[in-house]
């Protein structure tokens, strides 16, 4: 069965928005060139080895591999095979002195290969790309809503039954990810951060959930090894009295949703710090609900962040967000897009933006407690959760 393609009308609209944004940035712009597969997917609906060239009145996708696949799955108007970057100059003989590129993803090696045939000076356009992707179209929102429904079903509905005495972190994460993929999920989580890798997600028990990783995230994990700080440990087994952190994304047709959930495996009242654990959980639920009420078109992310920080109980301030300086983040084709609910983000939120909100509290000697859901900013009224509730089942009894 063929995969669902990005509609031609959607691609045309994105290209129009790109040209308008570039003209607003630089009225004299004459060419941009994108080689990153994610940018390529956004504007052409296919991910290939090649380059997308856009001018004010022309756009061509040059494909090294695989041209046949690109033609089969993309509705982009002009797709051409390319043996080398020399082929670009055959179509665009007048290469300008300055060409806009995605500086964050274009390597020096790729730039050198391009300059061998196309002598230009690169100029960054990353801010334009981020701004375009931050506001989702109706098509993109449909993808994310569908991902959110699947996400909620697996994490809230199926995951509790996967908890059992002796299951490892790695096995638990793998089983949950398999449940997502079996139901149409992508099986990958893409990031902008250089320190992040395209991985399944994490499952962490008790103290392991406090172990920081290179990824700018409150969720901790000791990983499968020192070389992979993700998924979870195959050695750490689940036992009664453990807290369980699941931070496992979901995605459909390129678009992600983010959701975290914490469980207590056993009877919470038997834990010596049951009161602290319960209070931390209630605090995180209240903070997520309050944040969601503030996520409105026109609201300023930095102001929301400061407001929520002021509501954190003094007893939990030291462990709030496990050392991270944000409360939530935009999400879409990657897990970590902009804007971010943090200091310095002063541009108002817009209808069609999607953000994950993830209040979490680190409790020494216990683990990370918290919640997370992905929200859609609407034209009027508070944001709507795409991934379900934050006040979910907490205690899972050992069967």
Each predicted region: which residue ranges?
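Active-site neighborhoods and metal-handling regions in enzymes and metal-associated proteins
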Residues: 1-399
């Amino acid at each position: 069965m063929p995969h669902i393609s990005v509609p031609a009308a959607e691609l045309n609209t994105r290209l129009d928005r790109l040209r308008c944004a570039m003209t607003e940035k630089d009225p004299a712009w004459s060419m941009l060139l994108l080689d990153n597969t994610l940018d390529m997917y956004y504007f052409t609906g296919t991910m290939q080895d090649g380059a997308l060239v856009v001018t004010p009145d022309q756009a061509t996708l040059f494909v090294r591999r695989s041209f046949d696949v690109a033609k089969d799955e993309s509705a982009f108007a002009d797709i051409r095979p390319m043996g080398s970057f020399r082929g670009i100059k055959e179509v665009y003989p007048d290469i300008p002195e300055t060409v806009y590129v995605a500086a964050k993803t274009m390597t020096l090696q790729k730039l050198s290969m391009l300059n061998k045939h196309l002598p230009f000076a690169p100029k960054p356009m990353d801010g334009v790309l981020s701004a375009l992707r931050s506001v989702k179209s109706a098509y993109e929102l449909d993808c994310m809503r569908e991902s959110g429904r699947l996400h909620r079903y697996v994490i809230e509905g199926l995951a509790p039954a996967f908890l059992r005495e002796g299951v490892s972190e790695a096995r638990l994460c793998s089983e949950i990810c398999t449940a997502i993929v079996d139901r149409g999920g992508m099986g990958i989580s893409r990031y902008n951060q250089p320190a992040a890798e395209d991985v399944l997600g994490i499952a962490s028990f008790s103290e392991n959930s406090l172990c920081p990783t290179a990824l700018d995230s409150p969720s901790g994990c000791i990983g499968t090894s020192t070389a992979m700080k993700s998924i979870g440990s195959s050695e750490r087994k689940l036992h009664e009295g453990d807290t369980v952190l699941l931070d496992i994304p979901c995605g459909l047709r390129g678009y992600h949703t983010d959701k975290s959930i914490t469980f207590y495996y056993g009877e919470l009242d038997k834990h010596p710090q049951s009161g602290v654990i319960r209070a931390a959980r209630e605090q995180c639920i209240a903070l997520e609900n309050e944040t969601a009420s503030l996520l409105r078109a026109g609201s300023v992310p930095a102001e929301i962040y400061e407001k929520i920080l002021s509501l954190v109980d003094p007893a939990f301030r030291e462990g709030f967000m496990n050392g991270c300086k944000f409360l939530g983040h935009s999400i879409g084709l990657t897990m970590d897009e902009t804007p971010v609910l943090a200091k310095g983000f002063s541009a108002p939120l817009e209808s069609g933006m999607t953000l994950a909100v993830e209040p979490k509290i680190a409790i020494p000697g216990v683990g990370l407690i918290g919640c997370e859901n992905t929200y859609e900013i609407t034209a009027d009224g508070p944001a709507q959760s795409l991934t379900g509730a934050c006040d979910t089942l907490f205690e899972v009894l050992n069967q």
